[in-house]
Amino acid sequence: MVIGIGVDVVEIERFRRSLERTPSMRDRLFTVGELAALADRVDPVPGLAARFAAREATMKSLGLGLGAFGFHDVWVRRLEGGAPELVVEGRALELATAAGVGRWHLSLSHVDSVAVAYVVAE
């Protein structure tokens, strides 16, 4: 049963400027694994923007706002075939469990100007 749906869109260039202005944001927002997974890309910012959107979409799927859980409580890893997988831990997992969520679906995409994440909580 679907418990919630969340979608978030991030303007890539605006996100890039934020990262340039505040370099410490990368470590605050993303796990070491996420940063390492994108380190070999010519431009990792679109992928980072999509992963940030995944966090926001997850909050929305639970009916929560920014600050409900830490940014490292939700992160994205790639499965062997390349599909993104949402990992939910810590406070986010507690809130999701209380809401009855036992399964997540995640879709990420980005084009020149925007990154989008779509999350379904079941």
Model regions and ranges:
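Core catalytic alpha/beta fold that binds nucleotide/phospho-ligands
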Residues: 1-122
